[in-house]
């Protein structure tokens, strides 16, 4: 049930503030999903 706790605390993780996250059972923590622009390093170009 540690996984459920990780999901609940996910909102408290800054990087998860506006994105989905998944639970990493092995590490017993919450992993934030990256935006596509983060994977390719193009986030800055998308900002107005």
Swiss-Prot record:
Disulfide topology: 3-16, 10-21, 15-32, 23-30
Keywords (A to Z) from UniProt: Calcium channel impairing toxin, Disulfide bond, Ion channel impairing toxin, Knottin, Neurotoxin, Secreted, Toxin, Voltage-gated calcium channel impairing toxin
InterPro entries given in the database record: Spidertoxin
Any Pfam family: Toxin_9
Cellular component, GO annotation: extracellular region
Main location: secreted
Keyword Secreted: yes
MF term (GO), any: calcium channel regulator activity
Tissue distribution: Expressed by the venom gland.
Family the entry assigns: Belongs to the neurotoxin 02 (plectoxin) family.
Record remark: domains: The presence of a 'disulfide through disulfide knot' structurally defines this protein as a knottin.
Function text: The toxin blocks voltage-gated calcium channels in rat cerebellar granule cells (IC(50)=200 nM).
Protein name, per record: Omega-agatoxin-Aa5a
């Amino acid at each position: 049930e540690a996984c459920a706790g990780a999901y609940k605390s996910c909102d408290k993780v800054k990087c998860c503030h506006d994105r989905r996250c998944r639970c990493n059972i092995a590490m017993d923590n919450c992993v934030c999903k990256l935006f596509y622009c983060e994977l390719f390093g193009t986030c800055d170009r998308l900002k107005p």
